[in-house]
Amino acid sequence: MERARRLANRATLKRLLSEAKQNRKTESTSTTTTTPLPFSLSGSSSRYVSSVSNSILRGRGSKPDNNVSRRVGGFLGVGYPSQSRSISVEALKPSDTFPRRHNSATPDEQTKMAESVGFDTLDSLVDATVPKSIRLKEMKFNKFDGGLTEGQMIEHMKDLASKNKVFKSFIGMGYYNTHVPPVILRNIMENPAWYTQYTPYQAEISQGRLESLLNFQTMITDLTGLPMSNASLLDEGTAAAEAMSMCNNIQKGKKKTFIIASNCHPQTIDICQTRADGFELKVVVKDLKDIDYKSGDVCGVLVQYPGTEGEVLDYGEFIKKAHANEVKVVMASDLLALTVLKPPGEFGADIVVGSAQRFGVPMGYGGPHAAFLATSQEYKRMMPGRIIGVSVDSSGKQALRMAMQTREQHIRRDKATSNICTAQALLANMAAMYAVYHGPEGLKAIAQRVHGLAGVFALGLKKLGLEVQDLGFFDTVKVKTSNAKAIADAAIKSEINLRVVDGNTITAAFDETTTLEDVDKLFKVFAGGKPVSFTAASLAPEFQNAIPSGLVRESPYLTHPIFNTYQTEHELLRYIHRLQSKDLSLCHSMIPLGSCTMKLNATTEMMPVTWPSFTDLHPFAPTEQAQGYQEMFNNLGDLLCTITGFDSFSLQPNAGAAGEYAGLMVIRAYHLSRGDHHRNVCIIPASAHGTNPASAAMVGMKIVTIGTDAKGNINIEELKKAAEKHKDNLSAFMVTYPSTHGVYEEGIDDICKIIHDNGGQVYMDGANMNAQVGLTSPGWIGADVCHLNLHKTFCIPHGGGGPGMGPIGVKKHLAPFLPSHPVVPTGGIPAPENPQPLGSISAAPWGSALILPISYTYIAMMGSQGLTDASKIAILNANYMAKRLESYYPVLFRGVNGTVAHEFIIDLRGFKNTAGIEPEDVAKRLMDYGFHGPTMSWPVAGTLMIEPTESESKAELDRFCDALISIRKEIAEVEKGNADVHNNVLKGAPHPPSLLMADAWTKPYSREYAAFPAAWLRGAKFWPTTGRVDNVYGDRNLVCTLLPASQAVEEQAAATA
């Protein structure tokens, strides 16, 4: 055996020596042949060559070397020449560069695609597309200009994370630590099949998250005791402000005072005070005992239950008195508390708001979290935000959809109930799954444990001789002491954060992560160094209940089987994946929604979002404990200022619509500071996003609408006349650039000058910033303020309808007015001189801080050149698709040189006359091809707006174009009379398996063609799970909670009978 092994080794060695000798011989006699490598470094379309230039591989300044493969091979092992020339230092640098992973087109593809559009190079296409008058020479960063590699980025984020100090938080105030169930963390929060989905406008390919959001609504209605809920709002503070607006609308604006009880969270009070200005409402803050309605001018009142300092009060008589005076009652509440407390609906509350954060969503230094708003059926059409409803599909089977969309900004514009667009769908889904996982008994057990720990703590403090509030409480204990600050400082030394209410009052709020050991540590802190003769465990048997008997919940909740079935990890895992399989996401195919920028959400960008050093910080923790976050904020602010040409940024707005509102409020504050109280006119193009007029209305501005010319550009003459007519009262002009028509308007700098010459400020909607970065900038163009949709241009995923971020950048003269916060003072980044902040826009000082690392890592890894290239490739991809499709569909708008920006509009209006086909039919048929439809009928009715982004490969662009071309041929069959106008493959789309596999098939086309209209679908196909959903039926028969299990079964049986 040993002899055989030696012989085998000797033979191997002989062979290797022979090969080495032959290689040396080849090296000396040939300069044209190369030795193959175990990986490819050749071919102009290689992903590796495209990101590492030839000059890097051969050494800068050298002539091309056709022997790169062999030369590199000299250090790869036996069989390659060892005496070859040395490799360049550049080639030894890290290879995990990011731009080549994000920007999909290779250099060879870029050239060929540009040529197909009629240009020699990508740069010549961009030069013809972006007006020369607004082009930047270059963009350079102070930090990260060359871009970090993915590995370097992770190390940098680890360094930042190490600078955050996660102390045990007892601060409360609406933010609590929670155990995120790992099955939910891994399979929803970290799962691109959930976080890369878009808002479920296309219901047939969104049934999974629609069901989860319906679970969320059912959870909210059950716990609050009110019959209607929306599918999430941005945070508790803004939800309260929305409720205040509802009260104003319910009273038809006739009563102009809104009272807020002093037991509400300070951030909620501040947001309502800020928001009230736009509605000309007077906000009065009073102690509960001092509230009266003698003025007859009160539209509503807001109370907290439990109160911000922990008290649990009986609001029965209070609400009766309010109703007797025709005053609506808003109650801010806590979902975990409502599992054991009498629900607000049983008191008679009209509206209930709150946050679902402590249902399995980390604090994240402030967000994102899903807020909620529940109300009665009477006020359903005045509710803000998305609402999920039950309807039926074309076969009569139950199907879900977004209900009552006519309330929303994209339809009603300035008459909408709210400017809300992006909400917090991903976080609502996490919270709903938390309730599904724990069920009613599990939630009640958590609540009772939290209450018990708080009660044991209160008992212990009494034994230590401290004064504890004698009112009922749930999870927060209020303590009177001679020196609150000294106790808080002592707690910090033990890595504990408490809330200091005033010099003599301190509170401690408990949550599901609190342990008996934590309570013992608190005893030592409050004992001030004196020995403690008891433990939390020893006191436990003495505690009974601190909730007044009349306020203990008796009514059942979460009785539906969904909340009582999936309590093991296997069962919940399968339920999550069953829902996930019903939804199309970026995991399946491109989502070419115009003005939505559904680009890559890279894994490296997402990783830090789940690290405890980022997730577990309370937003009101001392900033000394969040130095990693603060460094990131400062770096990000500097990067965004460079990208936009602005002087300062606020990171507080936690949605694009919130950014619009904040920017307009900053403009308003600027005018007021100059004594221009009369400047309240806002000019808005008719083609603007619906959020623009809705936001302007919220600020109290009067809206003047101007039109566009035949080429889709803003009518400059009409704008000039409007600006001059209103020059004495002009406040702002809102503009999107490139335009919502997908064109770089040549006169944009002239437009800005017209507004400035007439005393107004220019607000730029940053929705299309993906076509500006590195090529031009809002500040360079002439804008005064702009919000950025970080969930578009800067890679925060859309999450199926949120989260998002809408930070605003401003010029120097507006910087002093950027938002602040009542608990942790904030302002612009970098900080302006002489700040005069306007108040809070969001509940947390830095908005949804937890998702800012996504945009931060994207910018830092791309570097200035990578970002510039991304903008160029986004333009290239759109023009390539427009060129491929122009022979089949008219491209509606183009720039002066015949090109489009990063998106374009195809015109389908003619097909209604020739074939009875509308954009909805095309969008539904695209589902059969495995695609999400483009943006329908906006900004022009009867059209589709397509935005490919820079992240999609040429192969994917071609696949989508092929689908649309194939659909055009299907339309032609109708036009020729070969297919029935009313019964054809487009009108019948989409075709779910339940329809295709039914016993009976009555369609005039084959099942095979309905299901597999393209060859690529046979390899892998995403299946719609329902037929076309009936929107009219859903609104006429409005049901916004889970149907009783028995009813659902009966309806499904009837539909299949």
Curated annotation (Swiss-Prot):
A matching Pfam family: GcvP2_C
Record's compositionally biased regions (Low complexity): 28-47
Record CDD domains: GDC-P
Disordered: region residues: 18-47
Transmembrane segments annotated in the record for this chain: none
Cofactors (names): pyridoxal 5'-phosphate
Catalytic activity: N(6)-[(R)-lipoyl]-L-lysyl-[glycine-cleavage complex H protein] + glycine + H(+) = N(6)-[(R)-S(8)-aminomethyldihydrolipoyl]-L-lysyl-[glycine-cleavage complex H protein] + CO2
N6-(pyridoxal phosphate)lysine modifications at: 792
Lineage top rank: taxon: Eukaryota
Tissue: Highly expressed in leaves. Detected in roots and embryos.
Ranges of biased composition (kind: Basic and acidic residues): 18-27
Boundaries of the annotated transit peptide in chain numbering: 1-86
EC number(s) stated in the UniProt entry for this protein: 1.4.4.2
UniProt-listed SUPFAM superfamilies: PLP-dependent transferases
Induction of synthesis: Induced more than 4-fold after exposure to light for 6 hours.
Intracellular or extracellular location(s): Mitochondrion
Keyword Transit peptide part of the UniProt annotation: yes
Main location: mitochondrion
Gene Ontology annotations of biological process type: glycine decarboxylation via glycine cleavage system
Family indicated by similarity: Belongs to the GcvP family.
Quaternary structure (record): Homodimer. The glycine cleavage system is composed of four proteins: P, T, L and H.
PANTHER family recorded: GLYCINE DEHYDROGENASE (DECARBOXYLATING), MITOCHONDRIAL, GLYCINE DEHYDROGENASE, DECARBOXYLATING
Function description: The glycine cleavage system catalyzes the degradation of glycine. The P protein binds the alpha-amino group of glycine through its pyridoxal phosphate cofactor; CO(2) is released and the remaining methylamine moiety is then transferred to the lipoamide cofactor of the H protein.
Name of the protein: Glycine dehydrogenase (decarboxylating), mitochondrial
Species annotation: Pisum sativum
Lineage of origin: Eukaryota, Viridiplantae, Streptophyta, Embryophyta, Tracheophyta
Gene it is expressed from: GDCSP
